[in-house]
Amino acid sequence: MRCPFCGNVDTQVKDSRPAEDHVAIRRRRFCPACAGRFTTYERVQLRDLVVIKSNGKREDFDRTKLERSIRMALQKRPIEPERVDQMISGMVRRLESLGETDVQSKVIGEIVMERLAAIDTVAYVRFASVYKNFQATGDFEDFLSELRPPAPTTDT
């Protein structure tokens, strides 16, 4: 593995252990050339997925991009990093198990929305505001009104 600090190709594995509920291997690496230390993760990839964007453009599925958007929605929320890793791994497995190599970006967005709604409402609303392209406060109000149960009516 190439060192991200100096580019040396001869790095050493100092520690390996299961991660993400045994669906990945976390490796701690050391570069003898610059003494840099870094971590890598090894995961099983069942198939190469291609994302079809709403404008028709196709691009390779990027787990890191998915992870970044989810972590941004969960920023400063009381969710353990391990739970986030498990959630992301579960979403990737679900996408791979669809049986298709081409996946609409809308499908990915809906899966993320579903998972975030189950673990944190604030993160769900944050993600929805970007995913559904909210433009004004009214967009938030409309979305939040769909989340809230209707107020009980009083019969007098």
From Swiss-Prot:
One GO MF term attached to the UniProt entry: ATP binding
Keywords: ATP-binding, DNA-binding, Metal-binding, Nucleotide-binding, Repressor, Transcription, Transcription regulation, Zinc, Zinc-finger
Superkingdom, taxonomy of origin: Bacteria
Cofactor note: Binds 1 zinc ion.
Cofactors demanded by this protein: Zn(2+)
All residue ranges annotated as the ATP-cone domain in the record: 49-139
GO biological process, one term: negative regulation of DNA-templated transcription
Zinc finger (unnamed) in chain: 3-34
Family: Belongs to the NrdR family.
General function of this protein: Negatively regulates transcription of bacterial ribonucleotide reductase nrd genes and operons by binding to NrdR-boxes.
Protein name: Transcriptional repressor NrdR
Organism the protein comes from: Jannaschia sp. (strain CCS1)
Gene that encodes it: nrdR
